[in-house]
Amino acid sequence: FNPRLEFSISLLYAFSTSSFAYSSTGLNIVPGPFVILLSFYFYKKFDLQNKSIDIILCSMTMGFSLLLRNDFIIFSLMTSFFLIYLFLKRKQKIKNFLFLFIPILFYGMIIFQINSIEFGSPFLSEYTNKNGIDIISSNFPIYEGIVGLLFSPGAGLFIFSPILLLIFISFFDFYKIDKQSVILVLSFMITIIFFYGSLSTWHGFVSWGARYLVPLTPFLLLMISASLSTRKNKLFYLLISSLAIIGFFINLLWQIQDVSWFVWGPFGGNTGLFSLGIAGLHPLNLNPLVFWTFEYSQLIKAMILAFTNFQPDMYLFKVWGIVPSSVVLVSVLAILSFKLKSLLKLQ
């Protein structure tokens, strides 16, 4: 790997995936991927250098990730299993086990204390007497959730982040470089997809794309980095550039306008995509058409809105107007791009 490759992958993650859309929100899936990616970094560092400090840092970041989201325990468990596998093959097994589990236990005590204060019991992470939709049901077909998470027109991962389609090629390229990491990422990917695919709310309500799979995105881009470093033909670079531009445009639609209001409309109202839902028939007033057809997909509706009745949702657009704001924005991006290009040349 080299600085140019690392910079390219960072740009792809920042601007051509759903992470770009969510970057302007306060959702915990925004910092979450950074934390679990950091734990993966310390895991790989220990694998290569065999230093105890990396075990401690990996354990601490995994524990901290659980404070952000409970479902990050999936990645923490996967990484812990792989660390234990490394411990068993090396010396100082007991010391390594202590370095791994003591920080995790510390964060576990914090989580138990928070649960005790908030829910009255250290073993509860939510209220058990709440009413609402039953998100886990034996009547819900898991294959529907899995296909929906990946390919549905209204919320699919590969629809809203088309650059990730390259993983079907990149897994093989990365496997030749680092088999162990591929197995870890595949394990994480399969587990989280099956977990959220089993929920009737796999779509994340009115989220832009597969919100629950956003933490998986940087790991899939790591796979793509292997293809960038090994495949040098122009056709492949043209394919990557095209998918990146499409992904940027798709997620820019969400950034520049209020999709939640102008596309979905008020909950239970007579306008927007919510108006398609029938109370008592469609859970959460979400008609399946909004997820399974392009005609009623929020993506297509947002695209039509942008070109026919654009409602800017950016502060500068409202103050200066669209044209002056666009000129300033493009100028700033051009200057930053030039400076970054100069820095990369120095590398």
Residues covered by each model-derived region:
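Transmembrane alpha-helix segments characteristic
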Residues: Y13, C58-M62, F101, L105, ...
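Hydrophobic, aromatic-rich transmembrane alpha-helices
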Residues: F81-Y85, F158-L186, L220-S227, F236-I245, ...
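Perimembrane helix-loop-helix junctions
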Residues: K45-L48, I74-L105, L166-D178, L222
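Transmembrane-helix signature of polytopic, membrane-embedded enzymes
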Residues: F1-F15, P33-F34, N50-L57
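Transmembrane helical bundles and short interhelical boundary loops of multi-pass, membrane-embedded
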Residues: L235-Q347
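Membrane-interface alpha helices of multi-pass inner-membrane proteins
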Residues: I9-A14, D54-R69, S76-S80, L105-F106, ...
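Short acidic/glycine- and proline-prone juxtamembrane loop motifs at membrane-interface regions
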Residues: A21-P31, I117, G156, G209
